[in-house]
């Protein structure tokens, strides 16, 4: 499939916490869509190995959330490092989107970009400097159209691939109900 500069790359990461100076990436997934949000390709879901000391140092929320989802055990069993995961994602994305063309798409993606900058800098540079952050529309709906805001039932599973599809669905919802285009 030929790369297309109008496609959008959706990314989500799960991390051991929120501070990229202390925490690390434990899961990352990508999905490529057309501009109209039709899915073109689902990338690999990559679980990144991190040492037990880092996993043990997670706060209670992260231990509980990633424990219930089974992610902690997957991280312990993984042999994939951040550099390997980055390379796999770059190879996948190069098949679908030219470098530097797609904004980084997702929910609260400035957080993902901070972790990419620290631990996957080549992947961070693959994206255009712009972001397509669904949370912007969510915040506008909360303030300007509360009924629209309350109309989207967010599951927040905190699993990278599921969260991407939920972000795409949420943008479709806001496109129809808030933007009305």
Curated annotation (Swiss-Prot):
Residues 8-171 form the Exonuclease domain. Coiled coil: none annotated. Its main location: cytoplasm. GO terms for cellular component: cytoplasm. It is an enzyme of class 3 (hydrolase). Its EC number is 3.1.15.-. The active site is at 129. It is found in: Cytoplasm. Keywords: Cytoplasm, Exonuclease, Hydrolase, Nuclease. GO terms for biological process: DNA metabolic process. GO terms for molecular function: 3'-5'-RNA exonuclease activity; nucleic acid binding. InterPro entries: Exonuclease_RNaseT/DNA_pol3, Oligoribonuclease, RNaseH-like_sf, RNaseH_sf. 3'-to-5' exoribonuclease specific for small oligoribonucleotides. NCBIfam families: PRK05359.1. PANTHER family: OLIGORIBONUCLEASE, MITOCHONDRIAL. Belongs to the oligoribonuclease family. This is Oligoribonuclease. It comes from Bordetella pertussis (strain Tohama I / ATCC BAA-589 / NCTC 13251). The gene is orn.
